Amino acid sequence: SDEMLEQFTREYIEAQTMNQVLFTWHGGEPLLRSIDFYRKALSLQQKYAGGRRIDNVIQTNGTLLTDEWCEFFAQNHWLVGISIDGPQPDHDHYRLTAAGKPSWKKVMQGIKLLKKHGVEWNAMAVVNAYNANHPLEFYRFFKENGCQFLQFTPIVERLTRHEDGRTLASLADKDEISLSEASVAPEQWGYFLCAIFDEWVR
């Protein structure tokens, strides 16, 4: 509700001890909220800023980006994080739409719009058992697309088997734990990081 957004904004700003306050919009898909929601958020931030600098960053899968969104981000100097897992075969191996369709082309269209409007963007890339096997192609893809900042998040997903036969991801502390097929093995993760470091440091 508007009341909850206002209360959160006021209390969050009041709780900060620095002159710069960062709002991070992340979790689920934040672009499912309307632009009007974020306009309201900006208005409330200014109302309660008290002379502090307010910055915003939003993490999105990029598939819902439009010219209107990108104009909003550009005008208000938002940093946009894009969730993209490398070249098309890597990304589409696991990142499918709700309808089970590949999503890479839509994400790349979103990145193109961000560039068109001069929006600062970076990438958050999930490293899984599939794309960890070709780290240089993975890294070079981001360089070629003008990504200045890149964050790697390795998948290590624990599974437990329940008595009814279902296997579910969990934070279980039982002995009968296995990892999902997408999980990166320790040696694989180490190889991935070392290969990219050797390329980057040159």
Where are these regions (language model features)?
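Canonical radical SAM enzyme core domain
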Residues: 1-10, 30-80, 84-90, 97-113, ...
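Short intrinsically disordered, low-complexity coil segments enriched in acidic
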Residues: 1-9, 17, 181, 188, ...
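Glycine-rich phosphate/diphosphate-binding loops that line cofactor/substrate pockets in enzymes
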Residues: 13-18, 116-118
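Short helix-terminating capping/connector loops at secondary-structure junctions
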Residues: 15-21, 49-54, 202
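Active-site groove signature of glycoside hydrolases
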Residues: 17-31
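Structured loop/turn residues at beta-strand edges in well-structured enzyme cores
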Residues: 18, 75-76, 145
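Structural preference for beta-strand elements that scaffold enzyme active sites
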Residues: 20-24, 53-57, 79-81, 120-124, ...
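Radical SAM enzyme [4Fe-4S]-AdoMet core and its adjacent flexible, acidic
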Residues: 94-105, 112-202
